[in-house]
Amino acid sequence: MGFLLLIITGLIYGAVASVILFFIDWIIGLFGTPTILEQPFIVDILQRLGLPVESFTICCVWVALFFLTSIILFQLPPIQGLFLKFKNISKPQGDLAVYLNNCWSDVCRRAGVDPDRYTLYVQHSKQINAFALGHNRVVVLMGLIDEMNEYELKGILAHELSHLVHRDTTYGMTSAAMLNVYNAIIIAFELLMLIITTVYNVLRYIPFINILAVVFMAIVIFIRFIVRILHSLANFGYVLLAPFGSRIAEYRADRFAHELGLGQALASALAKLTRYGDTEGFINQLVSDHPPLRKRVAKLYELSQQG
């Protein structure tokens, strides 16, 4: 399911990004500036794929290459290392390291995986949370360590291990990489709109030229309207699809913890978290990337009753 949602996300944002890039190239071309997108290697790619060499297909190839480059960069350990430093995340030390590693080793033993494949990190924050990161990292916040007992902490770690085993974090990281490219193209389009608006505010006071400026500005406003509609539709689709996929992954991770014999430990931990609030209301639940805690606790209890 995660891979399918990733493909859908890429297609949706890729299509909209290609349209926006096409508009950017077309608007710049109206000023007599030659396109820089029609490079020989892009034409060669299209010809090898048997696709027509047209402005829009050229933009599609560029967006695909931008996506691919961003995805590769996001996978590089140095990039992930920068994120850890930026968030003040580090490896545990001393007694804390012994405690966490013992908990983690027990969870991995239950799952039949090598604990050395993964690395534990600690973030010195009072927030009660933990999350999987990249391909092989789990970050535990100090607030969670202080709040949970050893049994409950193992339940949380089992849940996070599921995200790594099922590559949920890899899919999430890939989606983030594509969204970064998409947002960069949106920013480029808005900057172009700002430049055009500034130039228009000067030209509209010049006789004769002002008529052409008004016509051109009308076309630009129409294009901007189309882009905003496409942008809204893409975001609306993502807001529904991404949380849906995330909620499926959360339930699967809870079941994974149950299968390791840590379902009740996780349920106890989640029950504690309900004291700090839960997702209420249909709309909030629809767009939330986590199911309501009370539903997750109930599901874990149901699984325990089934044996």
Language model regions located:
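N-terminal low-structure segments adjacent to metalloprotease catalytic domains
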Residues: 1-69
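Alpha-helical membrane-inserting segments
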Residues: 16, 20-28, 32, 69, ...
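A hydrophobic membrane-anchoring feature enriched in long, contiguous, low-charge segments
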Residues: 23, 38, 174-240
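Alpha-helical transmembrane signal-anchor/signal-peptide segments
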Residues: 36-37, 79-90, 247-258
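Transmembrane alpha-helices and immediately adjacent membrane-cytoplasm interface residues
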Residues: 51-86, 105-107, 230, 234-242
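Peri-catalytic and regulatory segments of divalent metal-dependent proteins
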Residues: 72-161, 165-170, 285
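Active-site-proximal gating segments in proteases and membrane effectors
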Residues: 112-134, 225-231, 235-248, 252, ...
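Catalytic Zn2+-binding segment of zinc metalloproteases
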Residues: 161-180, 262-263
